[in-house]
């Protein structure tokens, strides 16, 4: 220990010192020193280095000594904290170290102010106790040096050149910083790292192939470092020199004699901004014109002599480009067509045409429906007339057929009765009997069919039998017409169904049987009592 120890501590005999050292021998009880193994401090900030002793029962902390290990292995005292005499700071640390908890024997921590790079190293906290002796603990301190990044633009960028340096970003710190780029511009970058005794520097360069679209685009260098609470950014705006194509505008709407305020404009973008010159190829510029920037303005009304081919030349140090325009001046102002009015008029005309077409269509459809209705009525009337005529014909045919059949049956019956006695031959009698049975069966069949047809057609009104205004004599005359002899009896009855009802006036029904009404002309068939 240094000379200061003798001044601060009372004289201690060699016997007492040996006794203190033996107390921590195997089997003895010793305390524990608590501290951090490693700590970091940002350059220029304060850092607290803890050292706390957990004493056992009967132990007493006399003082705490802070030492820094040197490169040659020697320890250098920087602070001594005594429970009775206070703190002493040594050498270059004087004024930069203070006690963390003054007059607290158990807490031997110190605060190092305004940390600098030479403060990096290994520190030793030694606790002197009685009667246990000394206890040591080491602490590694690292000082972070945040970088101060810088960004430098490359040489001027010109459109059409090859790969060119756009910007370079450099940052130096401890430990080495990390550099990245943020941009919408397409390009490549290279990074180089350089080591220094107490720091490291990093340089990153960004390369592009210049185009006019890059002009004005941001290019940002992003620096990351443990000493930063957040990333740092440095932005550079790219400047690309170029000259765009030239065009003359302003005469497209048509110039005419007497037009006021006529102007021509020369459009040509570029970086730097180009300068403009005006001329007329077929002569000098007209009088009373003013050139202001990229505009050629006529200060008077136009005349026919102002026509010609005008030329504009733009230059900005990168190059020179020009363009021409032929200006024609009409004698009179061209009639302008109001597109809005034309559109509205067209819409109105189209609407009117559509309405007319709609009305005509409705009229034609209505007329067509009326014609169809009329034709349908005529058809119905025609069919009704034909139906009445067919009904009369069927009625006449049925009446005549019925009368003829009755007369034939009556005659056959009379002949059968008159010659019954003369026919003695059994075979002839048998044939006559069978013939009579067949006739009886035919008559009954005809009556049954007549009854069925009468029931089905009972709903037919009597008015259908004859036309309006037809006299009974006409009906009787039609009934006297002879039927078609080639038409079978059964078919006659079927064909004249609508007029059976009139003929059935001579019959009546009894227990499901059709019986003829008694009359003077009635005859009996086959002797069975059926009156026809």
UniProtKB/Swiss-Prot annotation:
Residue spans, topological domain Cytoplasmic: 366-532
Assigned keywords, A-Z: Cell adhesion, Cell membrane, Disulfide bond, Glycoprotein, Immunoglobulin domain, Membrane, Repeat, Signal, Transmembrane, Transmembrane helix
GO annotation, biological process: cell adhesion; symbiont entry into host cell
Signal peptide: 1-30
Bilayer-crossing regions: 345-365
Ranges of residues in domain Ig-like V-type: 31-142
Location (main, coarse): membrane
S-S bridge residues: 51-125, 169-221, 266-312
CDD domains recorded: IgC1_2_Nectin-3-4_like, IgV_1_Nectin-4_like
Location(s), subcellular: Cell membrane
UniProt-annotated glycosylation sites, renumbered to this chain: 189, 282
Cellular component aspect of the GO annotation: plasma membrane
Positions of the UniProt region annotated as Disordered: 152-179, 453-491
Residue numbers on the Extracellular membrane side: 31-344
UniProt-recorded name of the protein: Nectin-4
